[in-house]
């Protein structure tokens, strides 16, 4: 096990790993401990009360964070005709068909999100081995295979994040940047929690939102009291 640096020890000394912090306090600690010389990403992990081995309990979806992510995303769209024009008007960075597929095959993947009109899947389907491992393969479950490509582009540009439970039943995603104030981070977390609640499998039993922890790129993890998230949303 790697030794902790003096900086890491000092940061961990500011957090009680056994304590559940109220949402406002949790974000204050995380932001105070994000002392790197760059605008650290603020991330969240949510452990769900599901069995990820069961196909009917795989939680997957997307949500537009109301305060964005702090990152400008490049969006590629597979579309033709009027759909292609709509995608361009909505702000897509790259729009194409076979020509875009050739770019992908050549390894030119200078984009963060790929969106596809349903009628283009005959082309996009051949790119699964390239796009899939990079998390770029369009999927209707997260709104990236859709006839409404314009809205999908706008959502991606507005700060939409995709989420999918891992084998341990945990969701990992970003909430923003160190430069965001606590209220913006809180609003984004509440939007994510609302989306996760809507995506709850009917077969999930017991407590659904089991653990929530927030952290920064180079900082510490802080556990959040789920009740405080719900209370803040209702208040």
UniProtKB/Swiss-Prot annotation:
GO terms for biological process: regulation of translation; translation. InterPro entries: Ribosom_uL1_bac-type, Ribosomal_uL1, Ribosomal_uL1-like, Ribosomal_uL1/biogenesis, Ribosomal_uL1_3-a/b-sand, Ribosomal_uL1_CS. One of its GO terms (molecular function) is rRNA binding. Transmembrane segments: none annotated. Pfam families: Ribosomal_L1. GO terms for cellular component: cytosolic large ribosomal subunit. Keywords: Repressor, Ribonucleoprotein, Ribosomal protein, RNA-binding, rRNA-binding, Translation regulation, tRNA-binding. Part of the 50S ribosomal subunit. Belongs to the universal ribosomal protein uL1 family. Binds directly to 23S rRNA. The L1 stalk is quite mobile in the ribosome, and is involved in E site tRNA release. This is Large ribosomal subunit protein uL1. It comes from Methylibium petroleiphilum (strain ATCC BAA-1232 / LMG 22953 / PM1).
